[in-house]
Amino acid sequence: MENLYTSKEEKTKITFTAIDNKNLNDITEPGFYVSASWDNNFSNLPSEIDKPSSKAFYLVVFSVGGGTYCQQIIYSFKGLIYYRAVVGFGNNFTQWRKINLS
């Protein structure tokens, strides 16, 4: 029974790819990403976290069609959540939208 549990546990783990010094417009590959340092360097962050000591976050990317349809969700280590998307071929990302949970 223990081996079965371990096998199941391995299938449910999420692997995060560490990122730094990136343009978020270029991250269109589906996956889970992490910026683990407050002072990492990025472009195209939401303005509220594009400040010194605010750039630690998780990024989740959903994408199909080689980025033709792409969604990015940022979960800031400061408790802020943002969303944006590309909604068709040749289009740019929409502006970041803050998600309020309260």
Which stretches of residues belong to each language-model region?
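Short intrinsically disordered terminal tails
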Residues: M1, N100-S102
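Glycine-rich, flexible loop motifs
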Residues: E2-G79, V87-N91
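Trp- and S/T/G-rich repeat-edge/linker motifs of beta-rich repeat architectures
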Residues: N91-I99
